[in-house]
């Protein structure tokens, strides 16, 4: 069997089975050490898969930190220390690496964390691996959704996918709303403003990186429940609506299946809604399995590596 036949999540299940691990399966790995609750996570960004060399190096550096911080936040933690390993072509301009680390530095200053080391190796294409350590008072994973919980998301959904499509068009000139969408793809901001809310109230939580339906399916499987989503409640930005109107697209499809938004998906009782956060109730946790949109079961078709 080839990896493309097994699939990304089939491979993860195989690794869990081989290692006999009870920890693997959340956005981070929770570890208790010297009375501290640590959250460990790692993400890889590869040239040609996650970004192109033509992208602004500072944005790539920002994103490399942000996608890891998003995992820590999703589990109710704050980022503390990072290690960065780089695979670099020998003909790469030194200025590219310098600008990459300027982006890293800006992200670390914003999220109040610190790069404490890393590694460098030669390769054909750029590869970036970030290992991040966070701390929390209460770990919130994917397996705690309760029957009757409301399902919430932060921010708006689908913007990153539209931004990527615009980038790939390689237009000579973009409209302001198009530039805003491109910015949301190149420079996502992890929702650090949600940490206290997730830590205090959420029963289950994860970030949205593979697409809403795909990630809701992960949460539903881990919690042993069904998630019902109402499409009319999905939060859509004005920029996404303008993009879809201009290019004849359906914004609901982008919200449901677009990846790399790095917003949060979480569940808790309806009455714990916080009016001071940009959270939207999009559905409910019910008895059953899988993800349903407007009463119809939907199979996940978000981002997959294999």
From Swiss-Prot:
Q: Which InterPro entries match?
A: PurM-like_C_sf, PurM-like_N, PurM-like_N_sf, ThiL-like
Which sites bind Mg(2+) 1? 42-43, 119
Q: What class of enzyme is it?
A: transferase
Which residues does the record give as ATP binding sites? 101, 118-119, 142, 209
GO function terms (MF aspect): ATP binding; magnesium ion binding; thiamine-phosphate kinase activity
This enzyme catalyses: thiamine phosphate + ATP = thiamine diphosphate + ADP
Q: Which GO terms describe its biological process?
A: thiamine biosynthetic process; thiamine diphosphate biosynthetic process
**Binding residues annotated for substrate, in chain numbering:** 50, 260, 303
Q: Which amino acids does the record list as binding Mg(2+) 5?
A: 210
Q: In which pathway does it act?
A: Cofactor biosynthesis; thiamine diphosphate biosynthesis; thiamine diphosphate from thiamine phosphate: step 1/1
Q: Show the SUPFAM superfamilies listed in the entry.
A: PurM C-terminal domain-like (SSF56042), PurM N-terminal domain-like (SSF55326)
Report the EC code(s) recorded for this entry: 2.7.4.16
Which sites bind Mg(2+) 4?
Answer: 27, 41, 71
Gene3D superfamilies associated with the record: PurM-like C-terminal domain (3.90.650.10), PurM-like, N-terminal domain (3.30.1330.10)
Q: How does it assemble?
A: Homodimer.
Please give the PANTHER family that the UniProt record associates with this protein.
Answer: THIAMINE-MONOPHOSPHATE KINASE
Q: What does this protein do?
A: Catalyzes the ATP-dependent phosphorylation of thiamine-monophosphate (TMP) to form thiamine-pyrophosphate (TPP), the active form of vitamin B1.
The protein's name is Thiamine-monophosphate kinase
Species, as recorded? Aquifex aeolicus (strain VF5)
């Amino acid at each position: 069997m080839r990896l493309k036949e097994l699939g990304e999540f089939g491979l993860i299940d195989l690794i869990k089975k081989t290692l006999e691990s009870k920890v693997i399966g959340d956005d981070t790995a929770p570890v208790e050490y010297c009375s501290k609750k640590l959250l460990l996570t790692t993400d890889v960004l590869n040239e040609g898969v996650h970004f192109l060399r033509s992208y602004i190096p500072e944005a790539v550096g920002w994103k490399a930190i942000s996608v890891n911080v998003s995992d820590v936040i999703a589990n109710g933690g704050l980022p503390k220390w990072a290690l960065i390993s780089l695979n670099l072509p020998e003909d790469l301009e030194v200025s590219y690496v310098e600008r990459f680390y300027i982006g890293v530095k800006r992200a670390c200053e914003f999220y109040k964390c610190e790069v404490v080391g890393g590694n460098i190796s030669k390769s054909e294409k750029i590869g970036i691996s970030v290992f991040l350590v966070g701390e929390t008072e209460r770990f919130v994973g994917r397996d705690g959704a309760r029957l009757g919980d409301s399902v919430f998301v932060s921010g708006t959904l689908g913007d990153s996918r539209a931004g990527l499509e615009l980038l790939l068009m390689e237009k000579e000139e973009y409209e302001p709303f198009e530039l805003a969408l491109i910015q949301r793809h190149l420079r996502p901001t992890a929702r650090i403003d949600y940490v206290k809310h997730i830590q205090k109230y959420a029963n289950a939580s994860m970030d949205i990186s593979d697409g809403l339906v795909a990630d809701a399916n992960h949460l539903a499987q881990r919690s042993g429940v069904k998630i019902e989503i109402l499409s009319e409640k999905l939060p859509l930005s004005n920029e996404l609506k303008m993009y879809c109107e201009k290019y004849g697209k359906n914004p609901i499809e982008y919200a449901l299946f677009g990846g790399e938004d790095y917003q949060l998906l979480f569940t808790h009782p309806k009455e714990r809604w916080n009016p001071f956060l940009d959270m939207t109730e999009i559905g409910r946790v019910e008895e059953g399995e899988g993800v349903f949109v407007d009463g119809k079961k939907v199979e996940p078709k978000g981002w997959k590596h294999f």
